[in-house]
Amino acid sequence: MPRGLELLIAQTILQGFDAQYGRFLEVTSGAQQRFEQADWHAVQLAMKNRIHLYDHHVGLVVEQLRCITNGQSTDAAFLLRVKEHYTRLLPDYPRFEIAESFFNSVYCRLFDHRSLTPERLFIFSSQPERSFRTIPRPLAKDFHPDHGWESLLMRVISDLPLRLRWQNKSRDIHYIIRHLTETLGTDNLAESHLQVANELFYRNKAAWLVGKLITPSGTLPFLLPIHQTDDGELFIDTCLTTTAEASIVFGFARSYFMVYAPLPAALVEWLREILPGKTTAELYMAIGCQKHAKTESYREYLVYLQGCNEQFIEAPGIRGMVMLVFTLPGFDRVFKVIKDKFAPQKEMSAAHVRACYQLVKEHDRVGRMADTQEFENFVLEKRHISPALMELLLQEAAEKITDLGEQIVIRHLYIERRMVPLNIWLEQVEGQQLRDAIEEYGNAIRQLAAANIFPGDMLFKNFGVTRHGRVVFYDYDEICYMTEVNFRDIPPPRYPEDELASEPWYSVSPGDVFPEEFRHWLCADPRIGPLFEEMHADLFRADYWRALQNRIREGHVEDVYAYRRRQRFSVRYGEMLF
């Protein structure tokens, strides 16, 4: 290889990342127009396109590098020099942390995810102590109640870039003040002020104002979801001021926000104060930098592994027919490997399963489907694997495992947030907690269906409960679009003997679903059946599902709220006139 080629390759990779992030910002900057035009299908398409941008630009860079090197193979020493040159380009680079992840992605694509060592990749950051330099413009603006909170909030709302009319600005401001007074008290509120992010956070059919409520006793989140009426007028639906509420809004089961962030690291640091329970990976994920979030997630895993004295074990719950799931007892994530062979009733391929997981990655998850990170050639030290799990891995996924002596390499796996399986949760709770869980489960099914997702296998074991008590779907191998399903009523029996027969008296085609049958496995527990019949009996009717299908086919996009209905101003305070 000619001397100087290493620098050219390093510059080519960084220029490729510049192009990718430029397109990322370009797609993101269109969020305001899509919101104002109420073009919800364009919102969904932009979300999917933005996710695809990263891999597309990695592919472009890989092709450039193959042209530059004339397709010649490169030795380890050459690659190390490329990384050294790349590292030297980063100290003055504003998005160095994501540029490192982009380098990793290019390397993995070039070498088919082999030889993934710290010397060749940015397993850990090259600049861990780097502080954020002074940024050209502040991320947020402070508002003080010098003339009272009504005047303050009027200034906040008037500063917004949205060009639509407000339905009733005075009403919304009074709702917010009433909520803040109930939360803080009049005296504390008078001594508090706001710091509001300059950029709105767009997702689904809402534009979120994100800020900090700085009080005498500490800093709280200040979140305002802005929606549109059917007439295209703006209104504020609620005000959220607890870290638990903010955590759900920025949750791992939701689609990524579209927020214009030329300096994502600075935005992540700013958000950290109001989202103290979120890891760095989760914050990058929330603002759409999902590939760098994967890097940070892997780093968090390595740090935990180095500091613990645990072994991987099979994850608690009913063993899956498609996935082998394992975890570290104290770690908040699970590792999912597609089995070599599935149970007989699972008539599908591994490629189908991977396609289902990709569908979830790109679709609106409406707060009800867990996000995943996909890894290839994942290395595990044998000493970290319990004997029982090692035996299970070799029994169920031997074709995906390479034995390296002291280590094994798993060819492909997913990492996902760990939750308590819903079937286990239901066994452990009583009273109001049981009722809440059943209500949450039914709401999850409804919201998934409204987003054009049919879970397929609706058993409780395929859902998990988060630390905030939300029910989230996490088993995707039978997932499909609602519009692909044929929801049918069970025909009346022809003769009394039909109901006793081992085979149905009616024909069943692929894609047929009979909602009446859900009752058999969802209501079998006498503690659960009456609650389900009370709150979700319509889920057992085929006409309910067909009506949802019709709305989807007509192009209707349902509203998705990251908070309970009872928190909406219209429910809490009614239509008060001001």
Curated annotation (Swiss-Prot):
EC number, as in UniProt: 2.7.11.5, 3.1.3.-
Q: What is its main location?
A: cytoplasm
As its record notes, the protein acts as a catalyst of:
L-seryl-[isocitrate dehydrogenase] + ATP = O-phospho-L-seryl-[isocitrate dehydrogenase] + ADP + H(+)
Q: What does this protein do?
A: Bifunctional enzyme which can phosphorylate or dephosphorylate isocitrate dehydrogenase (IDH) on a specific serine residue. This is a regulatory mechanism which enables bacteria to bypass the Krebs cycle via the glyoxylate shunt in response to the source of carbon. When bacteria are grown on glucose, IDH is fully active and unphosphorylated, but when grown on acetate or ethanol, the activity of IDH declines drastically concomitant with its phosphorylation.
Task: Output one GO BP term.
Answer: glucose metabolic process
Q: Which HAMAP family match?
A: AceK
* Compartments it resides in: Cytoplasm
GO CC terms for this protein? cytoplasm
Name this polypeptide is given: Isocitrate dehydrogenase kinase/phosphatase
The source's superkingdom equals Bacteria
Family the UniProt entry places it in: Belongs to the AceK family.
What is this protein's gene name? aceK
